[in-house]
Structure formats: structure tokens, C-alpha cells
Design a protein with these regions (language model features):
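Acidic low-complexity segments
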Residues: 221-302, 310-311
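C-terminal accessory domains/tails appended to large, multi-domain proteins
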Residues: 536-545, 549-622
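Bacterial Sec-dependent N-terminal signal peptides
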Residues: 1-23
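Extended non-catalytic domains of envelope/secretory-pathway proteins
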Residues: 261, 265-270, 307, 324, ...
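Beta-strand-rich, non-transmembrane domain signature
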Residues: 19-258, 330-333, 343-520, 527-531, ...
Length: 622
């Protein structure tokens, strides 16, 4: 086995060295023909054997020439033969041309080349802004090699997503060259651990080359794997809003003033006053806020469009009953202001859209807006998105909006705000009762809030999403109440029982054990921030009366308490008192994001607590 693995990686090393040369279509190697599996991502359905990009950048546009060669490894990989090349079609400022390609099969040791038929290349409209070139390779099967080339031209040369080295399938070799003939000043932004390690201190590079790149789906602890993938961006020292071009000296201020001015065209406090008056006030500000949320949720719906600038007035929105995120949040903001709340509208980039680069005030970094409401005399903030309101847990905004920072839409200087998440809480109580009639009964009650609950939750699997039962005994369900919201948490009650044999022993395991197994840390040179979905706290208690004739054996090393300077904390303890066995477990992850240099500290902490969670408690016959 060692020899086989060594030979596989030797092949990859030889292959990638060969691919450092320019990719020439129609000339495939024995290594490419014989490749059936990617050693560093063995479950891959297809692999990019080699790809090259060359960009000619001028002061008015750019031309990107792409060459790519892919091998199909499994039946699922056949989808890679369907190609879609998107481009910005409005005003015809972008285009894709020069598409050529072919399928290569080896039949009886001879190359069989089937070219793409130009008549089978289609130009399709995706929406009012974007179009795409679509084509499908002919005669494709498992083992086929497909290769294609095209040229993308664009007049949008102020903020360019120049080249992606990492894709949704692994890549053996990826090369990008830049020929900068522009007169203006441009910054090269490299994203990804591989690029930033290899080209650290080489800011003047015009050629980049990476080998053996895992698919971005393999990236762990990132909100948006594609956004955090290995790639190069090219950024001009200017920005555009609706055709305007401005220097970066006071660019953020200018940008937000432009946005705010467009909002002023749609703000109409007097028109919304009557609407606000018809929404009843509650006994306190929280109840009033909930009444406003109920009104928005009942009267307008999201049309599935994200936007940073409204396209409808409040009156039109209420009449049409459907609008974009910008339309809906403007209405929410205006009503709350009329009800006496202190509010702000914040422009942000959602997790699925990508992170903001603060050094470059570009409006297309943002894709939506949200509403921030101050409560308790300004001591607490509630983050709301009118398009995705949580009527029961108003303090927990949509998870997708929590992507570091946003910028307040207002007059004056630019003001960035951090979008902080509230801690989600999970409490579970498991009580085992060994009955004198030979039955074992489990009474379980779980309470949870925040992001431990979502609308897509499967009622049958609510209790199995995060915790397992402590006794590995098959129980028959007796009571399985529907999950209900009570005051500030969701509550689930469950009862099950079984007839048990007169077993010599029973083993109590840690209910959090399986959940903790997902936390693996395998990066060797992490340079990305570590992003967890949300901060949380677990509080778990297992209880059981000790049956007559049995005793509980607790290892003296079972008790554990681990705490880090980062605030993470884990505690477990087992004890016996007055004939009852109790197991207590707590786990706190206080923040959603940690800096890259904390990776090893996090790794060590999780390895410790995973080891602790493997410990068991034995209840055996005396």
C-alpha cells in the first residue's frame, strides 16, 4: 500500500512539472490517459488537468484568454461536459467569443477527437443584467478528456475577478499571467493560503502558478468556500457608481453619499405616518417592535431579488405587496422611525455574496441592506432583514447577514458597524428510570433557541441533530410532542421505553460526542480566518436512579475542565449522590470568528475535548 501511494504522488509530481509548460490542445500525455483517481481528493468525479489564463489589461478594458482541460472520472462527472460561461450583457460592455473545444477519447489505443459544433453554442439570457454562452461536449463518457478555449472581453476594468485557481472540482495545474498595459494604478489582491504562502513578498508578480489544488468544497470553517478560494483580483485605485468614477481619497464617504441620495428619492415620512399609527403600540418597546414585524410580514413579501437601492416607493410596495430587500427594509425603517424607534439602514454583503475588502470602496461588493433597531435606551441592537423576518426570535437575524461588517446609509462620514451575533443556547435534560417491572423509561426535554432552530427542521429528527442519547439502548417511542415556541426558546418533550434484560452492566456515553467529531483541523498553514456558523452554548444533564443491586463506576480522571484565553470552555463531571447518578456537560463557543493565527490553539482545544468526550461511565452489577 505504501508503494502504491508513493507512486501515485510521484505521478502527480511528474505531471505537474510537465504542465508548467504552456497547454497545447490536442496533445495529451500517457499520464493524463492513465489517471483514474486524484490522490489528494479520491472521491472527485472529475479533475481539471490543466488550465491557463492570460489577461491583457488596458486603461479602458481587458481581454482574458482561457484554456482548460478536464478529465471525467465517474458518471457523476459527466455534468462537467455542460459548460456555461456567464457575462454581463447589459449595454453590451462584456462579451465572450472565440469558443473552441473538443472531446478526446482513447479507442483501441488511438486518440479519437470530436470537436464542438459551432451551431451547438447557444447565447442565452439569464436576467436583465447577465447572459451566458452554453454548450455541451459531444461523445463524452467516463475517461473522456475535454478541452476548450474562449476569450472574454470587458470594459469593466476597475474591479476584476481575474482568475480562479480553485474550483468545485480539484485542479492539478493552474497558471495565470497578467499583461498590464493600463496607465492607471492597479493593486493585485491574492486570496487563499496557497497563493499567499507561495507569493508572499512578491507584490510585483505578473505570473502565478499553483499545483494540486483541492476543490473549494474541501475548505473548512469558511462562510463562503468559493469566495475564500485561491484566486487573484485586480483592483483599480478608483471606483464607479452608475458610471461615475472617483478617486479613493474620500471614496467611502462619496460612495455612501451617492447611495443615501438615491434613498432620499424614496423616503416619504409623511406618507407612512398613517400606516404607522394603525399599527398598535404594545405594553413595551419589544411588543411594539413585534407588532411592526407582524405588519410587514403580513402585508409584503420578498420577490427574491437582493438590492442595495430601492426601486419602489413605500406606497407602491404596499400596493404591489412584493419587493426587493432594499424596498422592504426601507418600508420597515420608515415605519419604525414613525413609531419612535432609533434605527439605521446598513448596506452589507451577505455570506453567500462574499466578504467586503475595506481598502477598495466598490459598490458591487455589497448586495443587500438590513435594519438595525436600538432598544433599551440604545444599550442593545436588534438586527432585522425585512425580507426574512423571524417573528418568534426577533433578536436572531438571518444567519446569512452576519458577514463581519456593514456600512450605515446616512449623511456625513462613512460609518462601519460590526454585525455581531447573539449566542445560541441548547439545554437538554435526559432522565433514565429503571423500573421495578423491568422497563427502562427515558424522559427527555430539550430547550433551544437561536440558530439551533430553523424553518426547515425535520420534526422527526429534532432531537438527533446535535445530541445522541446517553445509553446505547434501543427504545420505543411513547410520546414525541411537536416542537413549540415558549417565551424565548423552542421546547421538545420526548418519552420512550423498552423492556430490558437483567444486563450485567450499562454504559453511559457523552451525548455531545458525535457532535464534537465534526471539528477536525487539518490545515498546515492556515491564513484564512476561522469562521464558525454561530456562537453557542450547550448545557446537558443526564440523570439516572441507580437500580438495586447495581453500582456506578466513575474513573477518577473523568472530570475535566478546559478553558482558553479565546473564551472557549468545556466542562464535564459525573457524580453519585443519594442513589442517583448525574452526568453534567457544558460547552461554550463564544465567538463566530477567530483570527488565522489562533488556528493551532483552536485545534489543540478541540482535540482535548474530543478526547474527553470519549470517556464513559459504567453502571454494573455489584
Amino acid at each position: 500500500m505504501k508503494l502504491k501511494i508513493t507512486l501515485l504522488f510521484l505521478f502527480i509530481a511528474l505531471y505537474t512539472n510537465a504542465q508548467s509548460k504552456d497547454l497545447k490542445f490536442g496533445k495529451i500525455s500517457e499520464q493524463e490517459i492513465n489517471l483514474t483517481q486524484v490522490p489528494f481528493e479520491k472521491n472527485a468525479d472529475a479533475v481539471i488537468l490543466s488550465e491557463e489564463g492570460k489577461m491583457d489589461l488596458t486603461s479602458s478594458n481587458y481581454y482574458l484568454t482561457v484554456k482548460r482541460r478536464i478529465k471525467i472520472l465517474t458518471d457523476k462527472g459527466l455534468d462537467e461536459a455542460n459548460i456555461q460561461l456567464n457575462y454581463y450583457s447589459k449595454n453590451r460592455n462584456e462579451s465572450i467569443s472565440g469558443i473552441k473545444g473538443s472531446t478526446i477519447n482513447i479507442v483501441n489505443g488511438v486518440e479519437q477527437i470530436t470537436p464542438i459544433d459551432e451551431k451547438e453554442i447557444f447565447d442565452v439570457s439569464l436576467n436583465e443584467l447577465y447572459a451566458a454562452k452554453r454548450f455541451t461536449f459531444p461523445n463524452v463518457k467516463v475517461g473522456s478528456i475535454i478541452e476548450y478555449t474562449y476569450i472574454k472581453s470587458s470594459e469593466y476594468n476597475f474591479s476584476i475577478d481575474a482568475w480562479n485557481f480553485q474550483h468545485d472540482i480539484p485542479t492539478l495545474s493552474s497558471k495565470f499571467r497578467l499583461n498590464n498595459q493600463a496607465y492607471g494604478t492597479y493593486s493585485i489582491i491574492t486570496i487563499g493560503d496557497g497563493l499567499n504562502t507561495k507569493y508572499k513578498g512578491k507584490s510585483s508578480s505578473t505570473e502565478w502558478l499553483l499545483h494540486n489544488i483541492q476543490s473549494y468544497n474541501q475548505l473548512k470553517y469558511v462562510y463562503n468556500p468559493e469566495d475564500q478560494s485561491e484566486r487573484v483580483k485586480i483592483q483599480a485605485a478608483t471606483y464607479h457608481t452608475d458610471g461615475a468614477k472617483k478617486t479613493t481619497m474620500s471614496a467611502w464617504r462619496d460612495l455612501i453619499q451617492d447611495i443615501n441620495a438615491q434613498y432620499d428619492l424614496y423616503r416619504n415620512p409623511s406618507a407612512i405616518r398613517d400606516v404607522a399609527q394603525n399599527i398598535p403600540n404594545g405594553k413595551d418597546e419589544v411588543e411594539t417592535l413585534k407588532n411592526v414585524i407582524e405588519y410587514i410580514d403580513s402585508n409584503v413579501k420578498w420577490n427574491r431579488f437582493y438590492g442595495i437601492i430601492p426601486t419602489r416607493s413605500n406606497k407602491t410596495l404596499l400596493k404591489e405587496k412584493s419587493g426587493s430587500t432594499a424596498d422592504m427594509n426601507l418600508l420597515l425603517n420608515e415605519i419604525l422611525t414613525a413609531k419612535g424607534f432609533e434605527t439605521s439602514m446598513v448596506m452589507f454583503s451577505s455570506r453567500h455574496h462574499g466578504q467586503i475588502l475595506f481598502s477598495y470602496p466598490i459598490v458591487n461588493q455589497f448586495n443587500s441592506v438590513l435594519t438595525v433597531v436600538k432598544l433599551n435606551n440604545g444599550t442593545s441592537n436588534i438586527i432585522l432583514d425585512a425580507s426574512k423576518l423571524n417573528k418568534e426570535q426577533i433578536e436572531f437575524g438571518p444567519l446569512d447577514v452576519f458577514n463581519y461588517h456593514g456600512i450605515v446609509i446616512k449623511k456625513g462620514d462613512a460609518s462601519f458597524v460590526k454585525l455581531n451575533q447573539k449566542l445560541s443556547y441548547y439545554e437538554s435534560s435526559l432522565k433514565y428510570d429503571f423500573m421495578s417491572n423491568g422497563n427502562l423509561v427515558l424522559y427527555r426535554k430539550d430547550k433551544f433557541n437561536g440558530y439551533f432552530y430553523d424553518d426547515d427542521i425535520d420534526e422527526k429528527n429534532v432531537l438527533n441533530r446535535y445530541l445522541t442519547e446517553s445509553l446505547d439502548v434501543r427504545l420505543d417511542e411513547e410520546i414525541n410532542d411537536k416542537t413549540v415556541f415558549d417565551t424565548d426558546s423552542y421546547v421538545k418533550n420526548y418519552k420512550a421505553k423498552t423492556v430490558i434484560p437483567n444486563a450485567p452492566f450499562y454504559t453511559f456515553i457523552n451525548p455531545l460526542r458525535e457532535f464534537l467529531k465534526q471539528y477536525t483541523f487539518e490545515d498546515t498553514n492556515r491564513q484564512r480566518k476561522i469562521e464558525f456558523n454561530y456562537p453557542y452554548l450547550f448545557n446537558i444533564q443526564v440523570k439516572s436512579k441507580i437500580p438495586e443491586g447495581y453500582e456506578v463506576i466513575i474513573d477518577e480522571k473523568y472530570k475535566a475542565h478546559h478553558k482558553t484565553e479565546l473564551g472557549l470552555e468545556y466542562y464535564q463531571e459525573a457524580k453519585v449522590k443519594d442513589g442517583q447518578f448525574t452526568l453534567a456537560i457544558q460547552f461554550l463557543l463564544p465567538e463566530g470568528v477567530y483570527e488565522a493565527d489562533k488556528y493551532n490553539e483552536l485545534k489543540q482545544f478541540f482535540e482535548k475535548i474530543k478526547t474527553e468526550s470519549l470517556k464513559e461511565v459504567l453502571m454494573k452489577k455489584k
